[in-house]
Design a protein with these regions (language model features):
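Short, contiguous, pocket-lining structural segments
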Residues: 175, 198-200, 217
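Flexible loop/turn segments at secondary-structure boundaries
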Residues: 20, 59-62, 73, 203-204, ...
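C-terminal accessory nucleic-acid interaction domains of nucleic acid-metabolism proteins
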Residues: 1-25, 29-32, 39-42, 46, ...
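Catalytic palm subdomain of template-directed nucleic-acid polymerases
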Residues: 207-218
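Basic, nucleic-acid-interacting segments
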Residues: 37-184, 191, 245, 287-293, ...
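Short beta-strand
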Residues: 53-55, 194-200, 240-244
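Short, conserved phosphate-binding/catalytic loop or strand-edge motifs used
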Residues: 198-208
């Protein structure tokens, strides 16, 4: 274990030469990426409950997204982690949240040192919900309640929506890009500013900042969008969750806007056979892509993109200037 100083914090890192990807990308390189992207990434994860996907043994060879649509199965040896692990440093922010699974003691990434600490635990993927912790008011023992069916004055609120585009069997990220362009036109017509992001796999997410709203209302908006797209373009979009019906079509996974769900954070790495990153992109890049490789970005690519273009997801950080969620 080697002690390092990060932003005034002292923490230990280990096994820096250990490959975490089949091609040899090491833990040290993962840590370096998260340390260097932190200033750009942290505003998108700060004040949000963090779910981590850890790969302590590294990403197994042959780990790819399935060609069937739907949820990607966990790679052997990987696991999701919600509770703060044993040994969490005292300086790491934590927030207990009452969920259907019980009270979860979430980690919250507030500073670069937290991202470095998580990278040292081989937490390659970082997932966050669309609501923020500080918008709610904790109850007894500091526990925050998730939004339920009935509104309460203490529940946390969503400040963005995500349209998660899930391509069915036989489709790839180019199909997701085409779908994103169509969805963005609808969202812009509703007064929102759509922000596209590649998932680091076959999908694309379209985000938009919103004035604080109840998570069930954000979910209902994206569900309506799902139905509208399937009605307008039934040959390309499908409203059903059925894997069979989704073959060759795009499904808008509106359930990603539920309070209990989370999506891959902007600039998070992905646990795939090759190190890739969930990357904010421009609409011109989506429209002009001719190969899946045009929308696949490595950690080095992303760092270079940020140096050249800055944060392409900056419109998600509008705060009080965000548009109100369209009503039903």
């Amino acid at each position: 274990m080697t002690a390092v100083r990060v932003g005034g914090r002292t923490l230990g890192v280990s096994n820096l030469d250990k490959p975490l990807y089949p091609g040899g990308f090491t833990k040290g390189e993962v840590i370096d990426y998260y340390a260097r992207i932190a200033d750009t990434m942290l505003p998108h994860v700060r004040d949000r409950a963090l779910t981590r996907l850890r790969f302590p043994g590294g990403v197994p060879a042959g780990t790819v997204a399935p060609d069937t649509g739907g949820t990607t199965p966990l790679a052997p040896g990987s696991f999701y982690e919600k509770n703060a692990p044993v040994g969490t440093p005292a300086w790491v922010r934590r927030q207990p949240v009452r969920t259907s699974e019980g009270v979860i003691d979430y980690v919250v990434a507030e500073e670069t040192a937290t991202l470095v600490w998580l990278a040292n635990l081989a937490a390659l993927e970082l997932h966050v919900p669309q609501w923020t912790l500080s918008s709610g008011r904790p109850g007894p023992a500091g526990v925050l309640d998730l939004p339920g069916d009935e509104p309460t004055p203490d529940e946390p609120l969503a400040n963005r929506v995500v349209v998660d585009l899930d391509p069915g069997a036989g489709m790839d990220v180019l199909d997701s890009a085409r779908a994103a362009l169509l969805v963005a036109a609808e969202m812009a017509g509703d007064g929102l500013i759509p922000v596209p992001q590649t998932s680091g796999s076959k999908g694309v997410q379209v985000y938009a900042a919103i004035a604080p709203a109840r998570a069930p209302d954000a979910w209902a908006y994206v569900k309506r969008l799902n139905a509208a797209m399937a009605k307008a373009r039934p040959e390309f979009f499908v409203a059903s969750m059925s894997i069979q019906q989704r073959r060759g079509r795009i499904y808008v996974d509106y359930n990603q806007d539920l309070a209990a769900r989370n999506t891959i954070a902007p600039y998070s790495m992905r646990g795939r056979a090759e190190p890739s990153v969930a990357t904010p992109v421009t609409w011109e890049e989506l429209a002009g892509a001719t190969r899946p490789e045009d929308l696949r970005f490595s950690p080095t690519d992303v760092l270079n993109r940020v140096d050249e273009h800055g944060d392409l997801a900056a419109d998600l950080l509008l705060g009080e200037d965000a548009a109100a969620l369209p009503s039903g």
